[in-house]
Amino acid sequence: FTCFTTPSDTSETCPIGNNICYEKRWSGHGMQIEKGCVASCPSFESHYKFLLCCRIENCNQ
């Protein structure tokens, strides 16, 4: 299973069991973006502008 990850913003193989891609964005010294693989979707926090969780390879491109 592969997802885009930061800071490289390239598609990488996820560790076993981490089969959810995510992307979260928030403001702080400009727009901050974090992408990666997780076992469960992160909780939405009030400072986030955007949170995406998906189970299709590279869906967080």
UniProtKB/Swiss-Prot annotation:
Coiled-coil parts of chain: none
Disulfide bond annotation, renumbered to this chain: 3-21, 14-37, 41-53, 54-59
Tissue expression as described in the entry: Expressed by the venom gland.
GO MF term (any one): toxin activity
Keyword tags: Disulfide bond, Secreted, Toxin
Disulfide bond recorded as keyword: yes
InterPro entries noted in UniProt: Snake_3FTx (IPR003571), Snake_toxin-like_sf (IPR045860), Snake_toxin_con_site (IPR018354), Toxin_cobra-type (IPR054131)
UniProt cross-references to Pfam families, sorted A to Z: Toxin_cobra-type (PF21947)
Residues passing through the membrane, by range: none
CDD domains: TFP_snake_toxin
GO CC term (a single one): extracellular region
Localisation: Secreted
Major localization class: secreted
Family: Belongs to the three-finger toxin family. Short-chain subfamily. Orphan group VI sub-subfamily.
Protein name per Swiss-Prot or TrEMBL: Weak toxin CM-1c
Organism: Hemachatus haemachatus
Species classification: Eukaryota, Metazoa, Chordata, Craniata, Vertebrata
